[in-house]
Curated annotation (Swiss-Prot):
Family listed: Belongs to the bacterial ribosomal protein bL35 family.
The organism's taxonomic lineage, starting at the top: Bacteria, Pseudomonadati, Thermodesulfobacteriota, Syntrophobacteria, Syntrophobacterales
Protein name according to UniProt: Large ribosomal subunit protein bL35
Organism: Syntrophobacter fumaroxidans (strain DSM 10017 / MPOB)
Gene Ontology biological process terms, A to Z: translation
Pfam name, any one: Ribosomal_L35p
InterPro entries: Ribosomal_bL35, Ribosomal_bL35-like, Ribosomal_bL35_CS, Ribosomal_bL35_sf
């Protein structure tokens, strides 16, 4: 059986933690930042875990991560 390919687009966007969760960056942090409060921009800097509903799809896209 041939090796499975890693989806390179997903590999650049998601990282796996030591406990096996997938982490992602938050949206809305690239432009139009003047109207967003400093607290909101600070929260957007931190990553967050991927929802459980999407984990199975990510495991197929990232078999070796």
């Amino acid at each position: 059986m041939p090796k499975m390919k890693t989806n390179r687009a997903a590999a650049k966007r998601f990282k796996r933690t030591g406990t096996g969760k997938f982490m992602r960056a938050r949206a809305n942090k690239s432009h139009i930042l003047t109207k967003k409060s400093p607290q909101r921009k600070r929260r957007l800097r931190q990553g967050t875990a991927v929802d459980a509903i999407n984990v199975r799809a990510l495991e197929h896209m990232l078999p070796y991560l």
